[in-house]
A protein has these predicted regions:
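N-terminal first-folded block
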Residues: 1-24, 28
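A short, internal acetyl-CoA/4′-phosphopantetheine-binding micro-motif in the GNAT/acyltransferase core
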Residues: 29-36
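Conserved acetyl-CoA-binding loop-helix of GNAT-fold acetyltransferases
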Residues: 37-49
Length: 81
């Protein structure tokens, strides 16, 4: 899942490839320096989690930001693999 500028440059992204049937691994988050500190990573990760839930998948967070995000959002603990 990516946030792009008008020139199609990636300004923020969350990657979550499928690693097992029904399980994705949230393995990478990135936010360009120009957007840091504005809540972009949290917003993008929230959208990724909504997409994962809507697909009926479970998530295995392995990047430090995703691990921290799930700790701060215990209402999504049911999605953890």
């Amino acid at each position: 899942m990516q946030y792009l500028d008008d020139s199609w440059n990636v300004l923020a992204e969350v990657t979550f490839p499928q690693v097992e049937p029904g399980i994705v691994e949230i393995d990478h988050t990135f936010v360009d320096e120009s957007l840091r500190g504005q809540g972009v990573a949290g917003e993008l990760l929230g959208r990724a989690v909504a997409s994962i839930a809507a697909s009926g998948y479970y998530a295995r967070p392995t990047c430090s930001y995703a691990v921290s995000w799930f700790e701060k959002h215990p209402e999504h603990a049911g999605l953890l693999a």
